[in-house]
């Protein structure tokens, strides 16, 4: 397994929040705290350092007490732009990402992904969940925004984005990757609308 001190965590909070009406998703309150804070608190014990990627409300994110990195690619270019911002500031061999709108980040995410990456000799490790399809049969669902990445891939990601690439699954497919099955699909649930946020808060 890769030592905790060799991993930097990155909370991805740089999106437009368009499905939430343009609000900053990471700052929406869930169970008394911003969603990004929930993700941060669950990821922090698993890594040696933590960053937040954000493109607005920077002072609010800086108040969380960790460094904030801004996309170098303009116009809200998607999660890969945030990942590149993290890789450019990362001082460790590996970067572990999680989205700001997933308040139940698994507490064993780093351990399981790093073990699989080391054993497979891969450069990227991603979780996979099994979720029912329309017929109730289990369907594999890759969760690429939760990924452990070899920080040496920063230059390749820069090139991919400069060439107009934006799809995270297309970029990860360029590199040796390993997938790790997690049983708790709900731990990877992301909240896309204010209605979903209210519903989840009522259930918890």
Swiss-Prot record:
Keywords: Cytoplasm, GTP-binding, Magnesium, Metal-binding, Molybdenum cofactor biosynthesis, Nucleotide-binding, Transferase. CDD domains: MobA. The keyword Cytoplasm applies. GO terms for biological process: bis(molybdopterin guanine dinucleotide)molybdenum biosynthetic process. GO terms for cellular component: cytoplasm. Monomer. This is Molybdenum cofactor guanylyltransferase. It comes from Ralstonia nicotianae (strain ATCC BAA-1114 / GMI1000).
């Amino acid at each position: 397994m890769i030592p905790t001190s060799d991993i930097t965590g990155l909370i991805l909070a740089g999106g437009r929040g368009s499905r939430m009406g343009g609000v900053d998703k990471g700052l929406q309150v869930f169970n008394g705290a911003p969603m990004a804070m929930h993700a941060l608190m669950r990821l922090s014990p698993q890594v040696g350092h933590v960053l937040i990627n954000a493109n607005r409300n920077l002072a609010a994110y800086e108040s969380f007490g960790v460094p904030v990195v801004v996309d170098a690619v303009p116009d809200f270019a998607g999660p890969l732009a945030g990942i590149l911002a993290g890789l450019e500031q990362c001082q460790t061999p590996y970067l572990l990402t999680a989205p700001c709108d997933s308040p139940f980040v698994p507490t064993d995410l780093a351990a399981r992904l790093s073990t699989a990456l080391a054993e497979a000799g891969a450069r990227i490790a991603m979780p996979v969940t099994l979720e029912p399809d329309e017929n109730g049969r289990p369907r594999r669902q890759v969760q690429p925004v939760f990924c452990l990445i070899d920080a040496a891939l920063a230059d390749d990601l820069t090139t991919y984005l400069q060439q107009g690439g934006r799809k995270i699954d297309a970029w990860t497919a360029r590199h040796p990757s390993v997938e790790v099955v997690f049983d708790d699909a709900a731990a990877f649930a992301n909240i896309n609308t204010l209605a979903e946020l209210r519903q989840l808060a009522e259930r918890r």
